[in-house]
Amino acid sequence: MRASVLATVVAAAGFASALPARAADEVTHDRLLNADKEPGNWLHHHKNFSATRFSSLKDINRDNVKNLKVAWTMHLGGVEGGGIWTHGGLEGTPIVENGFMYVTDGWGSVYKIDAHGGQGTLVWKMDPKTDHDWAGAVACCGVDNRGVALWGNLVISHTLDGRLIATNKENGQVAWQRQVADPDKGEVITGAPLIVKNMAITGVAGAEYGIRGWLAATDLSTQKEVWRTFTIPGKGEPGADTWKDDKNSAASGGGSTWVTGSYDPATDTIVWGVGNPGPDWDNQYRPGDNLYTDSSLALDATTGKIKWHYQHTPNDPYDYDSVAENVLVDVPGPNGTTLKLALEADRNGFAYAIDRTTGKFVWGLPFVKKVTWTKGLDQESGKPIEYDPSKQVQRYNAAVTPHRDNKIADICPGNMGGKNWPPTAYNPDLKLWYIPVIESCNRITVEESTPEKLKAREFWTGGGPSQPFKITGSVTAIDVTTGKVAGKLETPFPNLGGILATPDLVFSGQPSGEVMALDAKTLEKRWEFNTGGGVNAPPMTFSVDGKQYIAILVGLGGAWDKWFIDATPELKRIQPGSMLHVFAL
């Protein structure tokens, strides 16, 4: 493994030490458990352990949001390219504690910003000194970093080249770092850490390079690994018999975990989404259901042992990974019971509610306008109607399923979804779940995979997509008490950024540059502002000095403007950028 370059810290314009001192509170497990009791702060990547991305702040509401204005902006770095990428982008969610904001750029530099006084002042920047060409060469889907976490007096972050870094919150000095992923194998890290008790949970990307996916827990006190659980079972382990070839395809079977998961403290359970099998499109190379790919996976947080799984698309031939966040909600059930659900909006175009205590299917429905790969879900199991457990290779709707004898096929939704990584949000008062939707179809071409074609740090996909069809988007609301679509606002472009929910508003952005606020009940547009850049990140909200703010990172990057831009030709005018926008009344 290549040796990591030491990270450096830059004091902003030499004045960090001259800023007025403010006492820092340590971020404890108790504070993280009770994050919603600190409404002015945003302490988790997904706002709370349940991943609802709901804030109770309501000074900005449906009646006055029309008066929302830019409060301040800040230019960040990380636009430069590397490897196969011409530029970096912004996909992160700012973390805010007691008026201080922590954000990352695509290369994993961490910025601390003082948000007091109605303006943003850079306190320090930590540059991890990632080797851009080496790491960027195996970043399948963009130069991306989705943010940081807080623990004690440390800012915990990842780098694209596979490091976990702890930075002193006060002075920006690196306290320690350790290598968690191995880019020599094609492993990179783009997701934000999840802090559970005294551990940082890390997910990995790299299924397009023939990795074997995993989740890993690092003890933040000792910097040692506590456990590592592979998402592709080893020989003799439960699920290993779902890889039925004689080529050891499981060893390069994918199952990456690149979106931050959720945590249920009542049962000490981590719930995490698992990505596509590899090679992506040649499912004849890997006969069997290919566990635990395309699954929601529940693990014992203390040991990493798998408690249950629910697989959405067995033997996936479409690159429909299930890597999305699982939102943990409690809703009224029959006869006075309470349903404890994990909600997942899949790239395959279906939304699922799973009993998070058992892993059993509760309900599912399509949330996109067009699904062609299957006729629907079996309402008992939630599996695609055409799924045949006696078959080692699934065809689903054979007319639109690409395979070695039908090398080119058009599928809906396309392999970006559905819903991709951009996070959903859930309003617990309205029981509405908001999904950032990609309304898509694309054309898939399959290439036969052989063991000889598998090489380290080279694409291992068994084909690839092209984009002859226009792709649009929507914000879709689902009533989780009924499992029915409650509303849909169609948008001219795919939703590549994600959702924020407040008591009576929903915030979202467009890759064409607009940030918008919608009525939480009706999805009627109440406010819109064009940032002048491409929105590829989710909005969040915080308060400081008694004033509420909305913040969003702006800078189009990721997979879209490299692999999918032909489906949205109007976005070719959007230039690379790296800006933080903050709004207030």
Regions found by a protein language model. Give the residues of each.
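Beta-propeller blade signature
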Residues: 167, 213-224, 289-304, 354-359, ...
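Extracytoplasmic beta-rich repeat domains
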Residues: 74-93, 125-149, 177-192, 209, ...
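Repeat-blade elements of multi-bladed beta-propeller folds
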Residues: 42-46, 87-109, 137-163, 188-209, ...
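Short, conserved, GDST-rich strand-edge loop motifs in beta-rich repeat architectures
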Residues: 202-214, 272-290, 439-468, 555-573
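Blade/loop signatures of beta-propeller domains
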Residues: 25-71, 231-238, 394-402, 464-465, ...
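N-terminal cofactor/phosphate-binding cores enriched in small/glycine residues
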Residues: 55-181, 501
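Blade-level signature of beta-propeller repeat domains, shared across WD40, Kelch, NHL, RCC1
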Residues: 540-585
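Loop/turn-rich, solvent-exposed surfaces of beta-rich toroidal or solenoidal domains
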Residues: 274, 330, 437-439, 467-524
